[in-house]
Amino acid sequence: MAGRAQGARWMARRVIGLTGGIATGKSTVGRLLAGWGIPVIDADLLAREAVAPGSAALAEIVQHYGSTMLTNAGALDRSALARIIFSDPQERRWVESRIHPSVRAAMQAAVEREPGTICLMIPLLFEAGMTDLVTEIWVVSCKPERQHARLKERDGLDDQAIAARIASQWPLTEKVRHADVVLDNDGDFAHLKIQVERALDQASI
């Protein structure tokens, strides 16, 4: 697939790009891989670090939107920012342009440090243009009704908020179309685990 990592230094190991839709089960797969000793680098955690108190990205966000973006403790008010970025695609792109470069740099550094197989768990793997960092793409998929139910249970979101978050990403069907491995998370944990084990047994793509 075009844009995938190339060159001799990538051929000796696998760089798994783990992605999917919101609340489809990416973290569950990540925990499975980590439990088997595979380093898992979480883009969401890196994004949080990118806007930590004192960071340049947080300063830019506050300058752009005002001090209402901060909690009383001086941290980013994620709920306040979410209300903006999930209602305005242009503002979402502006915020992402302040965060994604540092996330990408950290991912690249992790790949260069790790000589063996590594997993980059990146929800916006396609949207952020990071497919060139990986040698294969795994997409965790589930039916829309299960995705909605998980978002309601996990995040307490209403239907409008759920729709906005899902619409902010590529359609799951499109991600599946670009995947090397599709993990169906409509069944139970045992079913998902078997699929992950099989994917690991595959030869590097």
UniProtKB/Swiss-Prot annotation:
GO biological process, one term: coenzyme A biosynthetic process
Name this polypeptide is given: Dephospho-CoA kinase
Keywords per UniProt: ATP-binding, Coenzyme A biosynthesis, Cytoplasm, Kinase, Nucleotide-binding, Transferase
Alphabetized GO MF terms: ATP binding; dephospho-CoA kinase activity
Residues reported to bind ATP: 23-28
Function: Catalyzes the phosphorylation of the 3'-hydroxyl group of dephosphocoenzyme A to form coenzyme A.
GO cellular component, one term: cytoplasm
Matching NCBIfam families: dephospho-CoA kinase
